[in-house]
Structure formats: C-alpha cells, structure tokens
C-alpha cells in the first residue's frame, strides 16, 4: 500500500505505473480511509506495541499521508483559484460553488445520460466518412447553443471519439452542445490529415447548425493530449472568429521542443509517434513541425485559451503548457493555466477527483466567459 501511495509523489516510470498513478492521485483518498481502518485494527489488538507493529503503523501512516496529499494540494489551490479566474475572465464568469467539494471526492456525482446522435462527416479526400457523436444541449438558448468540439487523444495513432464520454454528457446537461469528432490516424495518415478532419468536422457542424440547435458563431475546441495539440493547431489559425476559445489538457504545443526534450527510452516512444504523425524528424519534415506547433502561431488575435497540465506527467512534459501560457501572456491573449503539481497524464479520468474537480471549475468559468458577448473577427 505504501509503495502504491508513493506514486502520488514520484513520476511514474512505466505505462503500468502511470495507470496506477492515476488511481493513486485521483482515487487515493478512498484508500487513505483503508489505511486508517488498518491502523485501527492494529491498535485494537492491544498488548505491547513492539517493533513490528510500530513499523506497520508507520508505513500505514505514511501511506495515508501520501494518498491524501493530492487532495490537500488541491484544497490549497482551490482557495485561490476563484480569484485567479476572476482576474482573467471577470466576476460574472466564476461559479458561485466551491472549486473543490469534499462531498464530491467521496460521493461522486451521477452523470445524466443523454441521447447521442451519430452522424457522418465526409473526409476531405472524398474517400469515405468519419463518425461524429453529437450531444444536444439541454435547455439550449433559442438562438442556438454554443458548441464544444471534443477532439480525442491517443498519440495521433489511436483513441476514438468515445474517450471520457461522461464529460460530454455533463457539458450537454449544462447547456452546451458537444460534438465528439473523429480524425484519420497515423501512420496511415500523416499531417495535415488529422487537422483537415477537424476543420471538416467544424464546417459540417456550422452548415447543419439550425437542425442541430447550435450557434454557428460560438465554437470552442477542446482536446486532451494529442487532441489538445490539434485543438490549438487548428484553433490558432487566422480568420476564424467563430472559434471563441480553445481548451487543451496535458497537450504538446511545440513539437520542435518536444523532439529536443524527449528522453530516449521514456515511458512513451514520442520519437516514433512524431515521425509517423509528421513524416519524419524535424530536419526531414520541418514544415509539418511548424504547422503542427501552435506555440509558433500565437498572435494578439489568438482565441482565449485554457490550459491544464499535471506536474507529474511522464507522457507530455508540463513545460509544454507552461511555455504556451508564457507565449500567450507575451501577446496579451486572455488565458488561464491551471497547474496541478501531483497530477499525471489523463488525471481527469476521475472527474470528481482532486484534479478533475479543479479542472472542471476552471472549464466552467472559461466556457461561461468565452461564450458570452461577441468576439471580433481576427485580423492577423
């Protein structure tokens, strides 16, 4: 138990350890209760404590502390998070609820399951269609609901539109239409195929806005990991005033930087992923690396952006989001960067965990802010 708890403190060195680290960091508070129960059982035995029992108590105490540490860090961040977000997005955008709820940690919310409509978006190359799952907004406004375009992760060579679908249901229940799109995958399809499919998905949604009940002038691109790279790469292109904002969780935004700073033999073979996605190393496919790196596309007209990243992410270095946040600040682009020191890649697998709650609070604030009012057309 203590070894498992240590994953809340250390960077996970292997894929299995990474998956266990998600459980330790975002569900560990449940196991901390188990540690407390075991301590009670040891003490209830009575008699002399002895070195063996003392060692067991120490280990259980350490385990409980480590397992509670993410929740403690989240609580500390939650105390200042509303004010941080108000400073960027305004008073009216921040929810009145607490950024972190103890009740939600131990009694997760039930997700209201909504109908899902699957549609087909024709590929740019005319060689078939790609499925799109659409979640209609609950009680959407008469003029059409804002639409969140959900772009899945998976290292550009895997994943699909059904990833973490509970988030789509929750957003739709809050009054946002959600479109979980598909895109062609590497290595069969290299850049810019995936980006073209994102653009095609948005075009489809805009052309069918009336029947879908969405506002064609209020889109938000939301991607996790590889999907976050696509969200910023596509969302930061000029001439798209209908893109009100971009959300990226634990994503790489500068693939030149990723190539230079990826260790050999890491938890993820990022060199292989980039080669098959972009067509080679940077010296072989420099244009693709440039086009796919939103970091180099930032201007004062870049859409408002929300970035979320875990400090213990062993798959995508948190410096990717940190650097993009600094770049956005240099150009005066409204943005927020939520850093979660304990969190690993895909921490939001548990939307009611310490990281999931803080990210959800920041997301709700962001969506309220960027879908209100009117964004002026970009002129870059």
Question: How does the language model describe each region?
Answer:
Residues 1-4, 11-15, 25, 32-35, ...:
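C-terminal catalytic histidine-bearing segment of alpha/beta-hydrolase fold enzymes
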Residues 4, 9-40, 92-143:
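N-terminal cap/lid segment of alpha/beta-hydrolase-fold proteins
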Residues 42, 200-263:
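Primarily recognizes the serine-hydrolase "nucleophile elbow" in alpha/beta-hydrolase
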Residues 88, 92-103, 232-287:
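Hydrolase active-site cap/lid region
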Residues 143-154:
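Short beta-strand element of the alpha/beta-hydrolase
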Residues 159-168, 174, 179-218, 237, ...:
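Catalytic nucleophile-loop/oxyanion-hole region of alpha/beta-hydrolase
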Residues 255, 312-316:
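Acidic catalytic loop of the alpha/beta-hydrolase fold
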Residues 301, 307-309, 313:
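Short beta-strand/loop motif that positions the catalytic acidic residue
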């Amino acid at each position: 138990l203590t070894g498992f708890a240590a994953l809340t403190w250390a960077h996970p060195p292997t894929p299995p350890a990474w998956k266990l680290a998600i459980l330790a960091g975002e569900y560990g508070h449940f196991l901390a209760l188990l540690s407390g129960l075991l301590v009670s059982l040891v003490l209830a035995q009575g008699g002399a404590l002895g070195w063996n029992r003392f060692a067991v108590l120490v280990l259980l105490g350490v385990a409980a502390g480590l397992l509670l540490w993410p929740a403690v860090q989240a609580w500390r961040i939650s105390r200042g998070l509303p004010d941080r977000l108000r400073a960027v997005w305004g008073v009216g955008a921040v929810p009145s609820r607490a950024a972190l709820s103890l009740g939600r940690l131990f009694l997760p919310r039930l997700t209201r399951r909504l109908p899902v409509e699957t549609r087909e978006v024709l590929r740019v190359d005319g060689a078939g269609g790609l499925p799109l799952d659409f979640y209609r907004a609950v009680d959407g406004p008469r003029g059409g609901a804002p639409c969140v375009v959900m772009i899945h992760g998976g290292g550009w060579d895997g994943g699909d539109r059904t990833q973490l679908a509970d988030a789509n249901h929750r957003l739709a229940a809050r009054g946002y239409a959600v479109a979980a799109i598909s895109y062609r995958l590497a290595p069969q399809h290299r850049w810019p195929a995936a980006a073209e499919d994102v653009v095609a998905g948005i075009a489809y949604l805009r052309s069918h806005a009336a029947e879908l009940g969405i506002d064609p002038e209020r889109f938000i691109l939301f991607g996790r990991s590889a999907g976050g790279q696509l969200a910023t790469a596509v969302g930061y292109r000029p001439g798209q005033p209908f893109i009100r904002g971009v959300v990226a969780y634990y994503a790489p935004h500068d693939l030149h930087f990723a190539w230079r700073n990826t260790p050999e033999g890491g938890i993820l073979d990022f060199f292989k992923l980039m080669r098959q996605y972009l067509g080679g190393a940077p010296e072989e496919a420099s244009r693709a690396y440039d086009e796919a790196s939103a970091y180099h596309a930032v201007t004062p007209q870049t859409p408002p952006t929300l970035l979320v990243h875990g400090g213990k992410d062993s798959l995508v270095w948190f410096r990717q989001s940190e650097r993009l946040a600094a770049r956005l600040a240099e150009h005066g682009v409204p943005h927020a960067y939520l850093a979660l020191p304990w969190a690993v890649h895909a921490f939001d697998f548990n939307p009611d965990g310490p990281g999931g709650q803080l990210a959800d609070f920041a997301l709700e604030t962001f969506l309220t802010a960027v879908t209100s009012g009117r964004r002026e057309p970009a002129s870059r």
